């Protein structure tokens, strides 16, 4: 199982579109694909799921990614396992994004500080989402986990990039894309 994050510090370069098409192409050649929509704009979720599915996932008893980390955000416990949406008749699943994912940024910032102080909670918090995602992937024989990230270098994106096997930087041939790529190298280099 390979985990690949799609990230650029600049928006509008095709991260979500590339993630979506690569996932469906992999499924066409017989691979089992799990999408993870960690961009709070939730465009990957909107590409794959109907509005009814999204509304249900965001509801009180929903299964969005925010519902998974809500116990951490509220201080009630560790990550809660949620079930991704399975696209009918396809070898494709998606952990549904949520506009509220940005609420997790503050908790992750605190967790980075806890890691520097060698506190276990910091490690549990920063690994929580990808831990749950990878557990689902392993138990369902997923070949590829494709993670769509928003265009920022916040704590959530840093945690995910560091937890993935690879990350791809989609870009367009312009000065701002180049600058964004240089910024990524500065942060992760």
Feature names for model-found ranges:
Residues 1-189:
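P-loop NTP-binding core
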């Amino acid at each position: 199982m390979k985990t690949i994050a799609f990230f650029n510090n600049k928006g509008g370069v095709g991260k979500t579109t590339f993630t979506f098409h690569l996932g469906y192409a992999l499924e066409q050649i017989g691979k089992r694909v799990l999408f993870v929509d960690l961009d709070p704009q939730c465009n990957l979720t909107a590409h794959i799921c109907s509005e009814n599915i999204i509304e249900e996932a965001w509801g009180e008893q929903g299964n969005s990614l925010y519902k998974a980390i809500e116990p951490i955000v509220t201080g009630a416990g560790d990550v809660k396992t949620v079930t991704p949406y399975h696209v009918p008749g396809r070898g494709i699943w998606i952990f549904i994004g949520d506009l509220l994912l940005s609420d997790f940024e503050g908790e992750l910032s605190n967790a980075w500080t806890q890691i520097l102080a060698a506190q276990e909670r910091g490690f549990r918090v920063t690994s929580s989402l990808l831990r749950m995602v990878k557990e689902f992937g392993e138990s369902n024989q997923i070949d590829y986990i494709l993670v769509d990230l928003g265009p920022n270098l916040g704590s959530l994106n840093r945690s995910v990039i560091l937890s993935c096997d690879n990350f791809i930087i989609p870009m367009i041939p312009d000065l701002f894309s180049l600058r964004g790529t240089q910024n990524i190298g500065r942060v992760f280099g």
